[in-house]
Amino acid sequence: MLQNTQEEASAICIRTLDNVPVAFLHYTEALSGTGKKAMKSSGASYAVPLANAETISADIRRAREQGAAVVVVSLNWGTSGTSKPTNAQRKLAQAIADAGADVIVGAGTRVVQPVTWLTHKNADGTAAQTLCAWSLGSLLNESRKDGNVAGMLLQLQISWDGQNISFGQVSYTPTYIWRQKVDGAYQYRVVASDQSAPNGMSEEQQGYMAKALRTIQNALADSPITIRTK
């Protein structure tokens, strides 16, 4: 997510969803050498918010001060192709939870990683939990590696009584990146891999889709999350 100005980079994104003010914060764990040089040469050090505990904690505090009842932190992080979070991810996630985030949503590894609850304490000393989805996998890309064609959409039910929030159902929709050739050119379509195959999908592609679903289910086997049923 690129920020065009310093003011834009400093602003907290808060959207009201079903009368609940929700803050959305996004950060990137690391940049390529090319990206770093581009930011330095342009003087736009604010263009890509980098993930560090101090910055994120400060932004969470500002979000709360501006009225956010729910804080969602999304991160591009981790090691591509790995099915488990790194120690650095775990350390940062716990710091984000301790700072008061309610949900952490990761991407960047290209493959689905587990979902877990992180425990921390509120300012008043009461216990609280943060939902952490380490990586949602791939929603859309050109790669045809097995894990890279699988992803998931996260669905959360969150209630707010004016003071505290509580989680209801935590579920997901597994997805598959279907590639087919039409008039000599490849077309890509994202489909729910737990549903019936769409018209025109070959038996071979149906087999790949079933394999993608198994990959997701294996990754989430011990996670507190279920496939969405409606």
Predicted features by range, described:
Residues 1-230:
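Acidic, metal/ion-coordinating pockets
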